[in-house]
């Protein structure tokens, strides 16, 4: 862009005119003190007339207050400042005015009034009329409350609980607790039923004890002759089947406490040996853990067992000793350690 008569004044006027033309959108000054340099003849085509915002003034015109201004769609208030009869006014499409922000009374609001009733009672009486229009008609102004959506109603869920808390009635609270926890009401009935069952078990146990005593006394009464007892002892030593029967009878006669044939849990141990046999085998095991063939045959003849039975018993006893020693060692090691 080149100008025929370019001078510093003309250049400054052009820059000032462009800046003022661009800035005239944001502010407007109707005072006579606004800076407006006179345009020259050379700059007529590049002056403020080309911008379409402010008309250029001649030297003879002094009235700066009647200056016309453009109407922009995003500033509807400027339309009242300008003179519509001016020839320099450029017509713009009519714009819609910005609606004023005002609350209407026909807005659909929640009609149910709920929470915060205690807090709203503390409001100053002077503040209530200013917000009277916002409160729905169904709610009185004296007790305005916050509407709550329909999916959660505080009055429906906690109405009974609030009334009981305010009235301080223990009977009502007990009924509510029974409604909330129905299992607590059934506990006394269950306890009564348990007491009845315990009484029945005790009566049955007392009735079974004399029967056991009679059963234990009856074999002794049957075997009254000493000769028959000696014969039975000889038969038991000779035949292993009779030994198993005797061991079963001993298990029945013993109490269910932990014995050498009964475990602590009450179940029967898998032990086909009698007391006499186990005592003899234990003595030999304490003397020597490993047996030779000759010694094993002698023990089997004395205890009335086969060679294979004595061999298996010693193997099992060694495994048991190994297990017990391992458990004792672990117990000693863990006793010295402190677990945090």
Swiss-Prot record:
Annotated keywords: Developmental protein, DNA-binding, Homeobox, Nucleus, Phosphoprotein, Transcription, Transcription regulation
Pfam families: Homeodomain (PF00046)
Residue numbers of Phosphoserine PTMs: 238-239
InterPro entries reported for this sequence: HD (IPR001356), HD_metazoa (IPR020479), Homeobox_CS (IPR017970), Homeodomain-like_sf (IPR009057), HXA10/ABDB-like (IPR046333)
Compositionally biased residues, Basic and acidic residues: 242-253
PROSITE patterns reported in the protein's UniProt record: HOMEOBOX_1, HOMEOBOX_2
Residues in the DNA-binding region annotation: 266-325
Protein role: Sequence-specific transcription factor which is part of a developmental regulatory system that provides cells with specific positional identities on the anterior-posterior axis.
Family the entry assigns: Belongs to the Abd-B homeobox family.
Protein name in the entry: Homeobox protein Hox-D10
Originating organism: Lagothrix lagotricha (Brown woolly monkey)
């Amino acid at each position: 862009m080149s100008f025929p008569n370019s001078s510093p004044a003309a250049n400054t006027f052009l820059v000032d005119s462009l800046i003022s033309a661009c800035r005239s959108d944001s502010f407007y000054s109707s005072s006579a003190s606004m800076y407006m340099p006179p345009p020259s003849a050379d700059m007529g085509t590049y002056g403020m007339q080309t911008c379409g915002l402010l008309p250029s003034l001649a030297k003879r015109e002094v009235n700066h207050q009647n200056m016309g201004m453009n109407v922009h769609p995003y500033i509807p208030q400027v339309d009242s400042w300008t003179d519509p009869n001016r020839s320099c006014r450029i017509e713009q499409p009519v714009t819609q005015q910005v609606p004023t922000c005002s609350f209407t009374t026909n807005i659909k609001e929640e009609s149910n009034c709920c929470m915060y009733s205690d807090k709203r009672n503390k409001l100053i009486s002077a503040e209530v009329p200013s917000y009277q229009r916002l409160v729905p008609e169904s709610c009185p102004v004296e007790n305005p409350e916050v509407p709550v959506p329909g999916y959660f109603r505080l009055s429906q869920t906690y109405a009974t609980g609030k009334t009981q808390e305010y009235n301080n009635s223990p009977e009502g609270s007990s009924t509510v607790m029974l409604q909330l926890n129905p299992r607590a009401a059934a506990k006394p009935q269950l306890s009564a039923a348990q007491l009845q069952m315990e009484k029945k078990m005790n009566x049955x146990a007392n009735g079974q004890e004399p029967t056991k005593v009679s059963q234990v006394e009856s074999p002794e009464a049957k075997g009254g002759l000493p000769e028959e007892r000696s014969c039975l002892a000889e038969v038991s030593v000779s035949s292993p089947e009779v030994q198993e029967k005797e061991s079963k009878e001993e298990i029945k006669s013993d109490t269910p406490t932990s014995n050498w044939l009964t475990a602590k849990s009450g179940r029967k141990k898998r032990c086909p040996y009698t007391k006499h046999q186990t005592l003899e085998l234990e003595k030999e095991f304490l003397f020597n853990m490993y047996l030779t063939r000759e010694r094993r045959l002698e023990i089997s003849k004395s205890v009335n067992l086969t060679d294979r039975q004595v061999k298996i018993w010693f193997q099992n006893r060694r495994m048991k000793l190994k297990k017990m020693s391992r458990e004792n060692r672990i117990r000693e090691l863990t006793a010295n350690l402190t677990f945090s």
